[in-house]
């Protein structure tokens, strides 16, 4: 373990972090991992065992501690209502691997007996519909804070946190690049994972609006998936090129016109999108929230985690 002077984090290299697994068994198979990983992620069994099992163990301990505290409070108050869910936020750039991290943690955490019901929600579902974004002239800023229906997202998390049954969340389609008519129902989970670009934004980002409420106000634990911006740009372009050969060709795909581009044109387009939208959003809105996370997963080449930072 490396502990930089004056750092609010404990820093672990891969070897030392892996030792914190503490003999927790791996309950997922190679085929399970293949289903969980994103199109451009490289999730190996070694990565799952050495990085994500220790993290799942840590989260299990946090959840157990919260459940114990809730039990004491309920006993004191004579309250028989079910405890609120433990809410985990996962933030980071586009193409850094947030979704794979979220899906893997959901699968691992649901194996523990004291919190078997784990739900995963992405903030994509709370983007404004394309029609609204177009009317407001911010279609080019999709993914930026102003493109989200924050009020609706906060209401959703608040209702789930309050223990309300059958809370609904809108569903986003990456195929049509828009909100669908489908709704996801979340019914009193033990753990709720919220994955999205800006889940760690707080009042520090909006000092002029002291009464604004944020998703970060409801988080019990937060994770930031980090990597060098040049690496993320490389991953984004690689993912774009793979989508061009697959998802972009599907009927109804919003991005079908990109399939007509040559290889060089497609790569140039992906780089342009990164520089004008995703890279800009990372620098302006996402990266500044990294230091608020309870835990940071620092990735290197091939999407493998090289370092873990845990807040003291």
UniProtKB/Swiss-Prot annotation:
- Pathway, per UniProt? Cofactor biosynthesis; coenzyme A biosynthesis; CoA from (R)-pantothenate: step 1/5
List the Gene Ontology MF annotations in alphabetical order: ATP binding; pantothenate kinase activity
Location (main, coarse): cytoplasm
Subcellular location per UniProt equals:
Cytoplasm
Q: Which UniProt keywords apply?
A: ATP-binding, Coenzyme A biosynthesis, Cytoplasm, Kinase, Nucleotide-binding, Transferase
EC no. given is: 2.7.1.33
Q: Which family does it belong to?
A: Belongs to the prokaryotic pantothenate kinase family.
The name this protein carries in UniProt is Pantothenate kinase
Tell me the lineage of the source organism.
Bacteria, Pseudomonadati, Pseudomonadota, Gammaproteobacteria, Vibrionales
Gene it is expressed from: coaA
């Amino acid at each position: 373990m490396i502990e930089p002077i004056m750092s609010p984090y404990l820093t672990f290299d891969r070897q030392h972090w892996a030792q914190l697994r503490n003999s927790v068994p791996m309950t997922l198979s190679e085929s399970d991992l293949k289903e969980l990983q994103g199109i451009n992620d490289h999730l190996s069994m070694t990565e799952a065992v050495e990085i994500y099992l220790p993290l799942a163990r840590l989260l299990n301990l946090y959840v157990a501690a919260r459940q114990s505290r809730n039990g004491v409070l309920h006993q004191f108050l004579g309250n028989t209502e079910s405890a609120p869910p433990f809410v985990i936020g996962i933030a980071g750039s586009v193409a850094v691997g947030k979704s794979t991290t979220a899906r893997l943690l959901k699968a691992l955490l649901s194996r523990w007996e004291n919190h078997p019901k784990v739900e995963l929600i992405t903030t994509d579902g709370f983007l404004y519909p394309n029609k609204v974004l177009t009317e407001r002239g911010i279609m080019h800023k999709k993914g930026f804070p102003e493109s989200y229906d924050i009020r609706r997202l906060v209401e959703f998390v608040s209702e789930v946190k309050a223990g309300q049954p059958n809370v609904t969340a809108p569903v986003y389609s990456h195929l049509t690049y828009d909100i669908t008519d489908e709704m996801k129902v979340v019914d009193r989970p033990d753990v709720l994972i919220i994955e999205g670009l800006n889940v760690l934004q707080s009042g520090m980002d909006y000092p002029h609006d002291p009464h604004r409420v944020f998703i970060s106000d409801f988080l019990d634990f937060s994770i930031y998936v980090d990597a060098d911006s040049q690496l993320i740009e490389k991953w984004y372009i690689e993912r774009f090129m793979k989508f061009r050969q697959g998802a972009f060709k599907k009927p109804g795909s919003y991005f079908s016109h990109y399939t007509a581009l040559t290889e060089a044109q497609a790569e140039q387009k992906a780089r342009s999108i990164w520089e004008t939208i995703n890279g800009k959003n990372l620098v302006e809105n996402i990266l500044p929230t990294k230091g608020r996370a309870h835990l940071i997963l620092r990735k290197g080449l091939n999407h493998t985690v090289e370092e873990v930072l845990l807040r003291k």
